[in-house]
UniProtKB/Swiss-Prot annotation:
Any Pfam family the entry gives: Ribonuclease_P
Top-level class of the enzyme under EC nomenclature: hydrolase
MF terms in GO: 3'-tRNA processing endoribonuclease activity; ribonuclease P activity; tRNA binding
Any GO BP annotation: tRNA 5'-leader removal
EC number: 3.1.26.5
InterPro entries to which the protein is assigned, alphabetical: Ribosomal_Su5_D2-typ_SF, Ribsml_uS5_D2-typ_fold_subgr, RNase_P, RNase_P_CS
Protein name per its UniProtKB record: Ribonuclease P protein component
Nuclease in keyword set: yes
Family membership noted in the UniProt record: Belongs to the RnpA family.
Subunit structure: Consists of a catalytic RNA component (M1 or rnpB) and a protein subunit.
HAMAP family tied to this protein: RNase_P
Protein function: RNaseP catalyzes the removal of the 5'-leader sequence from pre-tRNA to produce the mature 5'-terminus. It can also cleave other RNA substrates such as 4.5S RNA. The protein component plays an auxiliary but essential role in vivo by binding to the 5'-leader sequence and broadening the substrate specificity of the ribozyme.
Length: 163
């Protein structure tokens, strides 16, 4: 087949050469394109933009106590004790928290669980600005969230940080 034999101009039949008349959708306007692909994400969007920002934690992110000096200063702070935790605090310009869970509490998985619970409890409480140290006792591993919550509040009340 030679190039001379191939038609370069569409045939003038008045129909779209891609679809025959019987296969055409009569309700679709001529020249309409396919709808954009459906789904949660647009092709150019990143997941974080499409889903939206992650909601903030109930009380916001807690700032950690940093350095040995901060922990040493807390030795002179006001103290309170509960069944599962003991707390010490000093007034400060911002709220900073140190959580101590010793190996006596259990293996790493158990210690991390206790720390996560204590961090969440402290986030939920609206604490005044202070440097706060929370030390978990070995019995804290048996406490559920509600018991630990009540005990932290009890210790904070005894220390005078909250009413």
């Amino acid at each position: 087949m030679d190039e001379k034999d191939v038609a370069t101009q569409p045939q003038e039949t008045g129909q779209n050469p891609r679809l025959s008349g019987q296969d055409e959708d009569p309700g679709r306007p001529e020249g309409a394109e396919a709808p954009p692909s459906e789904g949660a994400l647009a092709p150019h969007a990143r997941r974080s933009e499409a889903v939206g920002p992650k909601p903030p934690a109930p009380g916001g992110k807690l700032l950690s106590l940093k350095g040995d000096r901060a922990f040493q200063r807390l030795r002179k702070g006001r103290a309170g004790r509960g069944r599962y935790v003991s707390v010490k605090w000093l007034p400060a310009a911002e709220l900073r928290v140190g959580i101590v869970v010793s190996k006596k509490v259990g293996k790493a998985v158990v210690r991390n669980k206790v720390k996560r619970r204590l961090r969440e409890i402290l986030r939920r409480l609206h604490l005044p600005q202070a440097h706060l140290l929370v030390v978990a006792s070995p019995e804290a591993r048996e406490a559920d969230f509600a018991e630990l919550f009540r005990d932290v509040v009890r210790a904070l009340r005894k220390s005078g940080l909250v009413q």
